Amino acid sequence: MQSRWLLLKNPPDHTRLRGLVHKAFTPRIVDQMRQQIQSITDRLLDAVQGDGQADLVAALAYPLPVTVIAAMLGIPAQDHDQFHVWSDDLARSLDLTDEPEVYNRAGRSAVALTDYLREIVARRRREPGADLLTALVQAEEAGGRLSEDELYATCALLLVAGHETTINLIGNGTLALLRHPDQLQRLRERPELIETAVEELLRYDSPVQLTSRLTLDRVETAPLPCLGPEVGS
């Protein structure tokens, strides 16, 4: 599954897949997503409002992204916990590790997630809904559509890419604001700065600190030679 992720593709496949996925994010879908995110966030915060204190990661940062993505894809609420498990397993496989079990678990979860999505996609073809998955199924550009395998891979990528990054952004960003109370107070007084603040927090303490890549051509960096796909950086 991972080999079909848009994130790991080069042109022209990357360009084609990106265009098709972009088609699915229509203004209607984006507005619907915004409403879903607000509703889910409010519900999670309401659940701990009267407690006096809360674990930010456990109460909000961890459950929010997968719940939102699953809802956007039209996944029934009773299956959201299973999506958390699959997302965790797949996300861990992106770390640089030499533990075989990490990749074994990711492989098993990829198979289970694909089997699950196969049924959901078939249902959306028969009964289109007002959700992102239906939009992905129906997305078309230059006469082309996502293949079945590309659909499953794209759904999995949305799940994984939005999971760990959002958890880390909420945690890192909140910690940064607590360490700089003047900036926190400024944001409280001027909530219209929130979008700029999020962009700056992404830059200041990035949710992803490292990623691996394989070079396709011979390049030199610092000043070591990288000899095409033989060397990762």
Model-derived regions, located:
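Cytochrome P450
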Residues: 1-233
